[in-house]
């Protein structure tokens, strides 16, 4: 899959305002859940989405906060896959 241009990344980020660009090659969002079990349940849901998409995020859990970072390693940056998975993750919590 082709790496996105800066203009394409900017366009996609406008549609995903809760996500931010870091290091010019990944998008990141931190989710705040009710408690640790809710955070684990959320991560489990993300894991099933990621596995189905064949695209696996970096996930960091800190009690009730979950940080998710998306990039396409084999493309060396962001692709449509990252923004598609970000959209699917956003839908988990409505």
Curated annotation (Swiss-Prot):
Cited SUPFAM superfamilies: PCD-like
UniProt keyword terms in alphabetical order:
Lyase
Tell me which domain of life the UniProt entry assigns to the organism this sequence originates from.
Answer: Bacteria
**A Pfam family of this chain:** Pterin_4a
Q: Which GO terms describe its molecular function?
A: 4-alpha-hydroxytetrahydrobiopterin dehydratase activity
Q: Where are the transmembrane segments?
A: none
CDD domains assigned: PCD_DCoH (cd00488)
Q: Tell me what this protein is called.
A: Putative pterin-4-alpha-carbinolamine dehydratase
- Origin organism is Chloroflexus aggregans (strain MD-66 / DSM 9485)
């Amino acid at each position: 899959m082709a790496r996105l241009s800066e203009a394409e990344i900017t366009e996609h980020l406008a549609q995903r305002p809760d996500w931010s660009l870091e290091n010019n090659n990944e998008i990141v969002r931190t989710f705040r859940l009710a408690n640790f079990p809710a955070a684990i349940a959320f991560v489990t849901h993300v894991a099933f989405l990621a596995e189905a998409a064949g695209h696996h995020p970096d996930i960091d859990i800190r009690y009730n906060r979950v940080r998710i970072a998306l990039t396409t390693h084999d493309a060396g940056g962001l692709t449509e896959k990252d923004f598609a998975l970000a959209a699917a993750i956003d839908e988990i919590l409505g």
